[in-house]
Amino acid sequence: AIDAIAQSDPDFNQPVELSGDFLNLNLNTGSGVYKGNFIAKQGSMKFEGNEIKVKQKANKELDNIIALGNPVKFKKKNYSSGEIVSGSAKKITYDANKLLVILEGEAEITTDLGKSFRSQIITYGLTSGEIEAKGNSQRRVQIIIPPNSARKSTPIVE
């Protein structure tokens, strides 16, 4: 299954590159915190913000990334649709095991084709392209779908 994912989305065959102004890393556990204008990249996927926490599994593979900022920015190419997906939130979690990105706090996802999703919490499936949005009493889920570019009325009677 991982090979099929890697073929359909080459980003997951790439190493994760991290940079920031300050790093506190535990070499034994592989967990660390980057602070100050951090950037985390894996292929076309990119996170930018103020602070990032990285957790690795015992085998040193990436487990998750938790990014904090005001806002944190996220961008990735969806290789199935060809769309560029961008997002922002106060907190973004990348689950490298489930290939999910969870945006929390004033969350927004947009595509370069004009689709837009706003909510308190948005979960985005990196390989499936699925989006789940949850609102609350202060912010309901909002979806914007662009109009068709070339619409013509179909004759009622032929």
Question: Model segments located where?
Answer:
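Mature-chain termini and adjacent capping regions
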Residues: 1-158
